[in-house]
């Protein structure tokens, strides 16, 4: 098994996010691509990572390979990499994985392939009243601003707008409006007005994923799970599901 990706930044952002979810993860590397599913310890959120083989500079996988890793340790390795450096992941045995970071200086890491069981995740079929592609930069800024005043964000949709609103102590409030007119929404599908509260801390934990794409695909309904999708240029996506914060 040998795969090469020509810009390690995307993997850094993904693994950095995983450290907020899990201690150990499992990349299932198949002939068509790489997949990982993780559920946070409180079972409030779920992340599904799909990296298609077309995304990679080289992709040589004859038989399925399961790569179990400690998320904090892998994140430390990737943190060494510089911008746009190449990363290769390869193995000729089920016990060891070789990671090479290529730049002005090649750095080689041999790590143990640990035993990790994939989580049991029930099949979820959700229907959404609202779907919209929001500017990732604006979404990240908004979540950071709201998290400074409260731990709950209300997501509201009315016709051609999506509003993110937070109310803090002593009447403090922040409200950011996304619309096509301002360029903060690229496209939107609207069936009915919707409003739902979510834990802003869980959204803060995944903000590194906004670096994967210019737009974040948001989908939700009133008091139903929120779905965020980050589509990577070249072939891959990360999907995040978050349960509503209901009293």
Swiss-Prot record:
Record Pfam families: PCNA_C, PCNA_N
Keywords attached to this entry: DNA replication, DNA-binding
GO biological process: leading strand elongation; regulation of DNA replication
Record InterPro entries: DNA_clamp_sf, Pr_cel_nuc_antig, Pr_cel_nuc_antig_C, Pr_cel_nuc_antig_CS, Pr_cel_nuc_antig_N
Stretches assigned to coiled coil: none
Molecular functions per Gene Ontology: DNA binding; DNA polymerase processivity factor activity
Subunit and interaction comment: Homotrimer. The subunits circularize to form a toroid; DNA passes through its center. Replication factor C (RFC) is required to load the toroid on the DNA.
HAMAP family: DNApol_clamp_arch
Family: Belongs to the PCNA family.
Task of the protein: Sliding clamp subunit that acts as a moving platform for DNA processing. Responsible for tethering the catalytic subunit of DNA polymerase and other proteins to DNA during high-speed replication.
Name of the featured protein: DNA polymerase sliding clamp 1
Species of provenance: Sulfolobus acidocaldarius (strain ATCC 33909 / DSM 639 / JCM 8929 / NBRC 15157 / NCIMB 11770)
């Amino acid at each position: 098994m040998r795969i090469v990706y020509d810009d390690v930044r995307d993997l850094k952002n993904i693994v950095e996010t995983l450290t907020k979810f899990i201690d150990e993860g499992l990349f299932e590397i198949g002939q068509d691509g790489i997949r990982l599913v993780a559920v946070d310890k409180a079972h409030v959120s779920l992340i599904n990572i799909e990296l298609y083989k077309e995304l990679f500079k080289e992709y040589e996988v004859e038989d399925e390979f399961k790569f179990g890793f400690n998320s904090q340790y892998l994140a430390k390795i990737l943190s060494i990499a510089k911008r746009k450096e190449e990363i290769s992941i390869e193995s000729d045995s089920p016990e060891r994985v070789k990671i090479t970071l290529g730049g002005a200086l090649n750095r080689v890491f041999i790590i143990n392939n640990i035993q990790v069981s994939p989580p049991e995740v029930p099949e979820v079929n959700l229907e959404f009243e609202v779907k919209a592609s929001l500017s990732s930069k604006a979404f990240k800024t908004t979540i950071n601003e709201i998290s400074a005043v409260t731990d709950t964000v209300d997501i509201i949709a009315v016709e051609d707008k999506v509003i993110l609103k937070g109310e803090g102590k002593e009447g403090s409030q922040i409200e950011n409006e996304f619309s096509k007119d301002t360029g903060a929404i690229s496209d939107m599908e609207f069936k009915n007005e919707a409003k739902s509260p979510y834990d802003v801390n869980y959204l803060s934990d995944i903000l590194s994923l906004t670096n994967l794409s210019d737009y974040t695909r948001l989908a939700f309904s009133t008091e139903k799970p929120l779905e965020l999708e980050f589509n990577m240029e070249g072939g891959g996506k990360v999907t995040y599901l978050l349960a509503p914060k209901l009293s």
